Design a protein with these regions (language model features):
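Conserved Radical SAM active-site core
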Residues: 55-66, 70-127
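Flexible, acidic/Gly-rich N-terminal and inter-domain linker regions that tether
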Residues: 1-58
């Protein structure tokens, strides 16, 4: 970050925390084109995200909430109910982890993991 003035770098270091969710597990499909990760947030809540290799590049499916309040009978995310919304940083963190794992550019992001994105609209929109 040497492009920023020294006093700004000092202020950022003193006042800002930059952290990613912790990678817990990674599963890779037999064809190598799909990866699923389980990540843990700073409060020990966990969500899954998926990376899919498409003909146009990499697409990431992220979660927007821990759990879900919608009650859809076909979805496992709703079984424990809604725990909380993910923050903007936690949503972005899922994408950043895949970028680091693949060393490739992520071409698209789909918000369709755990949770109902419209119930966390502001954070999803900012992410």
């Amino acid at each position: 970050m040497t492009q920023f003035p020294k006093d700004l770098r000092q202020w950022l270091g003193d006042n800002c925390v930059i952290s990613l969710p912790t990678l817990i597990t990674e599963s890779i499909a037999p064809d190598g084109k799909t990866r699923k990760i389980l990540v843990e947030m700073s409060d020990q809540s966990r969500v899954e995200a998926v990376l899919m290799e498409q003909h146009y590049g990499y697409s990431v499916c992220v979660s927007s909430q821990v759990g879900c309040a919608m009650g859809c009978v076909f979805c496992a995310s709703t079984q424990g109910g809604l725990y909380r919304d993910l923050t903007v940083a936690e949503i972005i963190g899922q994408v950043v982890i895949f970028g680091a794992l693949t060393k490739e550019e992520i071409h698209s992001v789909v918000v369709m993991g755990a949770g109902e994105p419209l119930q966390n609209y502001d954070n999803v929109l900012q992410a």
